[in-house]
Every structure is written in C-alpha cells, then in structure tokens.
Amino acid sequence: MFRDYMAHVSYNYDSRYLADVVFSYSGSGKLPTGDKYRIYPAVSVAWVASNEQFMKRFSALDYLKLRASFGITGNDSRLSYDMDKQFNGGGNSYIFVGTSSTYGLAQGGFPSTGVEPEKEYKANVGVELGLWKGFSMQVDAFYNRRKQIKGESSGIYSTVVGRGMPFLFNGEVKNYGGEISMGWQQQLNHFGYSIQGNVSYAKNEIININEGYHPYGYMYYTGHSIGQFYGLIAEGLYQKEDFDAQGNLLPGAPVSTYEAKLQPGDVKYKDLNEDGKIDNYDHCYQQNTTLPEIYYGFSLGLNYKNWGLKANFQGVAHYSVWNTLASVYRPLYGNDKSISRYYLENRWTETTPNARYPRLTTLSNNHNYQNSNLWMEKGDYLKLRVLELSYRLPTKLTEKMRMSDCRLFLKGMNLFSIDHIDIMDPEQINAEYPSSRSYLIGINVLF
C-alpha cells in the first residue's frame, strides 16, 4: 500500500482573479523498488471580467470569464510488474523423487527497464459568456499529449533471441480539439421556451508506437489516428470486358495473390506499389476513421401553463463504420450460410454491373473479403433520443390529495434516426439488433 500526498492552494481576489494550484506525489507498486513515486502538478487561472468596474456599462453582459489550465496526470493501469523476470512452467514432466512428476521452468519474457507510468500533459483554454438574462455560451479548446505509453518492442528487435522481448515505455499520442455549447431560455407569462446545443471536435495523432520496418511509407501507423482504417483500396468490380475469351485478366491488370483465378464481379483493388500483384504490401491507412471525430446534440423545450414538451437530439459526424456482419454483408462466408435480401439486391450480376457488392458464390473467395474500403460506409447519424410530453396537476388539486407535486408524462426514446446506412443501425453496426425504440407512460409524485 502506498500513501499519496496532495496539496491544494486556491486564490480568489475580489471574485475577479482566480487561481488554483494542485500538487500530487503519488506512488505505485507496479514501479521498480526505490523508484515508486512521481510528481503530478496542475495549475489553473481565471479572470471574471464581468466583475470589473469598467464592464458595468455593458448592460447586456451578465457574465464573462476567461480561464486557462495546465496539468500532468499519471496512469499505471497498463503496467504489470514489467521490471520482474518471468518464468514459465510446462512442457514435459519428469520424475525425480518418488512417483511425483515435476515440470521444468524456463525464462519467459525479458524484464523491462525504464518502467514508467503513462503521463498525460493537458492544456485547456476557455471562455464562459452570459448575455441578456437568458443566453449562455461556453467555448473550450484543448491539447493533450500522452507520453511514456507502454508498447510492444517486437517490431524493432529481432525475434531470433527465442524469448519474449521487453516492453518499451516511449509510445506517444497527441489529442487536440474543442467544444462549444450555447443555450437560450425565456419565460413569457404562461409560455416559456428553451434551446440548447453543443458540438465537440477531437482528433488524435500517433507520434510513436515503436513500429518495425515497412517497405513502403503508406504502411506505417505512425502519423495516423487511432481507429484509422487499414486495408486495400477498392476501385470497383471487375467486368466481363476486363477478361479475354479464356477468362483470364487482360495484360497489365494486377494478379491477386489471394485467389488463383478471378472472375467478373470480383473486387478490383489498387496496386499501390505497382508491382503487378495485389498482396499485403498494397494495404494502407486510409482517411476513414472508426472513431467519431465530431459529437453534437441539441435540445428543445416548450412549456405552457401546466403542459411541457421537450426533445433531445444527438449525433456524430466524421465517422465511418466497417460492415463485417457476415449474415448481412458476407453471405455464405465462414460458418454463416445465410443470405440477406439486402445483399441479393445489391450484388454484382451481368445485368447489374454497377452493383455495390461483389458476385455471390458458394466457394471460398479470400480475394473479395479482404479488408478494404468496399466494406466501409459513412456512419454519420442524427437521432431523436428522447421526446416527452408532460402535464403537471394544478396545485389546488394536489393539495387536496396531500401531494406536493404530481406530474404525468408520455415519453418515447430512439424514435427515429437520420443516417446513410439502409438496413443497419450505424451505432450498432455489427450487432444482431439495433438500438431499441421504447415508449413509457409514467407518473412522478412527491409528498
């Protein structure tokens, strides 16, 4: 057990100038003996400009605050006593004494040196604004840099040593982005309304992951984003005119190493290194990312006397999904022998040469089912998460029933989605069932 020591100093001058300093001295049992503690500081400053005397002349201004912060945090969750030697039992057993057999021990992975917890350097600047007794806005921009990330070293060391290689602690990723939220609310006698919205953008870039050698620059993960798609570039489907009378590809077309003989309706891939072959050296990192870069949402509210109506919307953008559900997108592939109507209607045939998906076959076809952008679709969506109609009983009536409040409501959830995928929920693309639509009737009572 390790004690953590923390100090916090807060400064507030006339509710105008604010500052906080936090200092943490934290230990971890997963670090080497004699080197188990690390220092993690953080500082934040703010200026509430609306409290300045010279700002009082702006009658529309309710609140204005400028702030900035910087801090360092640590994370040892991925550490696993990596500095210790490992010995593995097993293999053949032998009898040395009596009739009991004994297994031998062999050195496992090499111990790691320079074991460090992951560190994240976080910087943030923001503005908070209030106007006209009803409008509010908050804007934030951030930049984070994660360092000392634990990673495999097998990519940079030879495998001929016969033992598991030590981990390295020099992985690095940067994250940056921003968020903006705005809202307006107003009450006019018996009628009131409100609208709120927010949008955030976040992107990451891999600085170092200890990659081994790749013969082509487009094969390196470094410099790309976590979740960025890796695979072949599909350029369409082969047509009958791409083959000669004997069924062979015309001269100049790259030969597939995944399938001995291609046919019309098979996927046409780009030969990136122009060596006349389609193989693993033609895989590359593409623009598609399987992690949304933009999240957004907005809510609307109306009230009139005892009636209320509210709606919450949520969506994502800059997002791609990889369609790998065999029963829908890869018929007769592997152990799944079903064929979806969607695939039948969108597969290649001689009468549908511009189809989206390759020809249907009962035979194995490793060429068509390689990881490629053919199976990627735009995953952006906007969903109505909640729609609720409510009625609050009059006070005179609730008092007679000895209740302080009584509210009746009808609520619907996941009522509709606007997206680019015909038959699947982009939020649950590889699940058997989409997000469920549900309806609730309820009552809230306070006594």
Segments the model singles out, each with a brief description of its role:
Residues 206, 281-282, 292-299, 303-306, ...:
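Conserved SET/PR-domain catalytic core that frames the SAM/AdoMet-binding pocket
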Residues 171, 187-290:
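Conserved small-residue
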Residues 167-174, 213-229, 285-301, 329-345, ...:
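C-terminal extracellular loops and terminal segments
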